Amino acid sequence: IMGYLGNGYMQTYNQYGEPTLFIGTGKDGGGYMRAYNGNGDESAYVGTGRMGGGYIRTYNNSQKETSYLGTGSDHAGQLRIYNKEGETSSYLGEGYYQAYNQFGERTLFLGTGTSGGGYLRTYNFNGQETIYLGTGADSSGQMRVYDAAGETGTFLGSGYFRTYNQFGKMTTYLGNGKDGGGYLRTNNKFETETSFLG
């Protein structure tokens, strides 16, 4: 086991001459540390980024990045988890969480909207939105279920429920009327009323 102390850095080696640790100062003046596995491949990095924020990166034995914890380009904290191929599988950022499938398509979003309300979105394997559950523009709760084409199939809002056909036409309404009473309305595929109960 060997070590080397240089001008502004320290490096250690294993009995086979492979590097195991490097601690030093980068070109930008920030400090950093690199750890290596027994084969001399980098397994972890702790240090200062180009924009002055700190971060930690880990790597698998194929030199693919597996995690990132630190400051992002928006100067906020973030955590990224990667699959064994180095593709993003999870992201936790400033007020939200995202998950990705093996093809790199987003499958889940959980977070805070621009209006300050929370919501959850799910996506199919092609990245097409399938469900929205959260706060609507009027600050009430709502749920939308989308069909394969991305059109709203079902909508559940504050005091009402609606269904839609593949053409985006409303086929059913169950809920409250303007007078405060409840009613049920069904429509044909052209959204022409076929029955009314209320």
In which residue ranges do the predicted regions lie?
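Parallel beta-helix/beta-solenoid repeats that form elongated, surface-exposed shafts/blades used
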Residues: 1-198
